[in-house]
């Protein structure tokens, strides 16, 4: 079974072989959209036209990945994107920022990216 979003009982579903994959991790979508707006309001617009940003979600494929997801991604007290990462999304602090670079940062979001961030 595959499911979009997470729910109580995910661990049991993976342990029993009922769940093969979960799709989660939607919150960066709002962060990147906000940063595009922030740049425009702050005087460093990334485009003169409306922009489209595409968010790939996390594919959670095991009980171990589910634990990482719940511990780090779903925990409101842990941020995958730290202050430096967020500043890199703001033209005020990153003069080399372009719309393509912002989309590239968004494209990096994956379970591998999450694992890299929690190991810092």
Name what the model sees in each region:
Residues 1-18, 28:
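Venus flytrap/periplasmic-binding-protein-like
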